[in-house]
């Protein structure tokens, strides 16, 4: 039977599962993640070209540990087990797993067998640095398997049954700390499974537009446009699919950055002729936030108010049947995946869902994509770099960067300071080098001297961080002369500020945003 050109990853709770999917997609092959307790018939119906078993925090020796349906090892497709996945394969196929006294966490030196297909083309395979994260270990491999690699503390760090195209690794090839990890994954996908690199964003755009046309038919669609890359890409895709039957609603909550509304909406209306209605609700939001200092209350008030405003505007539209959202694949995974200890590190502070009584069907064009793939789609659609590479901006906007009470005066101080930070990062070439860089207005004043006069004015904090996925972050080592220019300009150009400080904390223990 001919199998489809895709890889299915079964998630056993590893924090690295999404990395596996991303590595495979980066190689040009479509991959999907499914929870380990998925109905095996669903996997059979998907007809994958290969199967990967992820790692996980559990022990196969525990009674309540997640298990693999044995029939999935009999599909006749190549299988790769990683960490916990290796131990599951060992257990299910007649080998033996034991609790290890010599646990391995972090880097280890791996000695691999160069004759094993998944290690082909790796020059240093006999002395490879790999990333381990396990307590149990394989003590006896199943019949028909051979040892393909060892470390100083474990004799079975990799195994293979090349006849049945079954492979297993005790280490994590998907993480950046493992040398040649991408080569190992690519060898499995291409040399073992024989899959083709046919997953491209150009083919996605073409297929997505056709699917949206078919699903929506002659109906109308409403979309909440935030100006971020996700909702912008959704808007352009849908506009190409259904034209003027897409109705975009942009809610100006008064908590946006300087000129944000004009820049984003102006571009989209001019170049893509989008049907955008701007709703000026700044006064309403600021009135709701008056006297509120608690960050969680700010978030909830902003979220509820946004829903009320959007609902009112959407309800006024006639014959709208669909609500479009910028849901991404990580959101889908989070809602469906096996809920192990890795499930939630921090709740998102983006504005929440819309009321169920809107009675609209959902359209989610990006639900198959990771964030980096959305950017590639944006390039395919001809969006400019100022939109594609816009740094993340929280749903509550500047409300969680103005610490303490929010007033129009304090918002304006922050807007001016933040604009200077953005200008200097762009001018120095650092904007694209960092994950996020922004200003924060602190809820205190300090004494200063300007000329011969004593001042007692506001403090601005600079928060500039490096990250890959926002789950962890470190402060960016931006050159001092750039920081000095930011500080000097803010103090001299922003009325009411006499001090600038730099936040040099990492996440964890701190978060990227201050509130």
From Swiss-Prot:
Domain Glutamine amidotransferase type-1 positions: 6-198
Sequence positions that bind ATP: 226-232
EC numbers on record: 6.3.5.2
Pathway given in the UniProt record: Purine metabolism; GMP biosynthesis; GMP from XMP (L-Gln route): step 1/1
Reaction(s) catalysed by this chain's protein: XMP + L-glutamine + ATP + H2O = GMP + L-glutamate + AMP + diphosphate + 2 H(+)
Domain GMPS ATP-PPase, residue spans: 199-390
GO cellular component: cytosol
GO MF term set: ATP binding; GMP synthase activity
Keywords, sorted A to Z: ATP-binding, Glutamine amidotransferase, GMP biosynthesis, Ligase, Nucleotide-binding, Purine biosynthesis
Entry annotation: catalytic residues: 83 (nucleophile), 172, 174
SUPFAM superfamilies attached to this UniProt entry: Adenine nucleotide alpha hydrolases-like, Class I glutamine amidotransferase-like, GMP synthetase C-terminal dimerisation domain
NCBIfam families associated with the record: guaA_Cterm, guaA_Nterm, PRK00074.1
Record-linked HAMAP family: GMP_synthase (MF_00344)
Function text: Catalyzes the synthesis of GMP from XMP.
PANTHER family given in the database record: GMP SYNTHASE [GLUTAMINE-HYDROLYZING] (PTHR11922:SF2), GMP SYNTHASE-RELATED (PTHR11922)
Record's subunit section: Homodimer.
Listed name of the protein: GMP synthase [glutamine-hydrolyzing]
Lineage: Bacteria, Pseudomonadati, Thermodesulfobacteriota, Desulfovibrionia, Desulfovibrionales
């Amino acid at each position: 039977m001919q199998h489809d050109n895709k890889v299915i990853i079964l998630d056993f709770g590893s924090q690295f599962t999404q990395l596996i999917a991303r590595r495979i997609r980066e190689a040009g092959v479509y991959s999907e993640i499914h929870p380990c307790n998925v109905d095996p018939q669903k996997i059979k119906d998907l007809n994958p070209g290969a199967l990967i078993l992820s790692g996980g925090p559990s022990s196969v020796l525990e009674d309540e540990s997640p298990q693999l349906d044995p029939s999935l090892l009999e599909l006749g497709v190549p299988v790769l087990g990683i960490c916990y996945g290796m131990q599951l394969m060992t257990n299910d196929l007649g080998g033996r797993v034991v609790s290890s006294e010599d646990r391995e966490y972090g880097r280890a030196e791996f000695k691999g067998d160069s004759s094993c297909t998944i290690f082909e083309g790796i020059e240093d395979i006999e002395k490879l640095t790999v990333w381990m994260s396990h307590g149990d270990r394989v003590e006896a491999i199943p019949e028909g398997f051979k040892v393909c690699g060892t470390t100083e503390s474990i004799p079975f760090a990799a195994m293979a049954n090349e006849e049945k195209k079954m492979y297993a690794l005790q280490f994590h090839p998907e993480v950046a700390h493992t040398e040649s990890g991408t080569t190992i994954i690519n060898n499995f996908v291409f040399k073992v499974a024989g899959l083709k690199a046919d997953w491209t964003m150009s083919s996605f755009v073409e297929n997505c537009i056709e699917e949206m046309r078919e699903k929506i038919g002659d109906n109308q669609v409403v979309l909440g446009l935030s100006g971020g890359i996700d909702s912008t890409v959704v808007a352009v895709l849908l506009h190409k699919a259904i034209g003027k039957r897409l109705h975009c609603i942009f809610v100006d909550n008064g908590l946006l950055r300087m000129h944000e509304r004009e820049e984003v909406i102006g571009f989209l209306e001019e170049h893509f002729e989008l049907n955008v209605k701007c709703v000026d609700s700044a006064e309403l939001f600021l009135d709701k936030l008056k006297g509120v200092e608690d960050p969680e209350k700010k978030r909830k008030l902003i979220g509820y108010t946004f829903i009320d405003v959007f609902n009112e505007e959407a309800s006024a539209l006639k014959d709208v049947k669909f609500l479009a959202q910028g849901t991404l694949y990580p959101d889908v995974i989070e809602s469906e995946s096996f809920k192990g200890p890795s499930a939630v590190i921090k709740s998102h502070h983006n504005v929440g869902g819309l009321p169920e009584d809107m009675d609209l069907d959902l359209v989610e064009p990006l639900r198959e994509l990771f964030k980096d793939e959305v950017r590639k789609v944006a390039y395919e659609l001809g969006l400019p770099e100022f939109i594609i590479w816009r740094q993340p901006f929280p749903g509550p906007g500047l409300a969680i960067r103005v610490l303490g009470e929010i007033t129009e005066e304090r918002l304006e101080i922050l807007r001016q300071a933040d604009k200077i930070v953005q200008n200097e990062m762009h001018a120095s070439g650092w904007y694209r080098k960092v994950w996020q860089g922004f200003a924060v207005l602190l809820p205190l004043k300090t004494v200063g001297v300007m000329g011969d006069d004593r001042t007692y004015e506001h403090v601005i904090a600079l928060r500039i961080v490096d990250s890959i996925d926002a789950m962890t972050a470190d402060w960016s080592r931006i050159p001092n002369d750039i920081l000095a220019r930011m500080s000097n300009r803010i103090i001299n150009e922003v009325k009411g500020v006499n001090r600038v400080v730099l936040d040099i904390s990492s996440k964890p223990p701190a978060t990227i945003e201050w509130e």
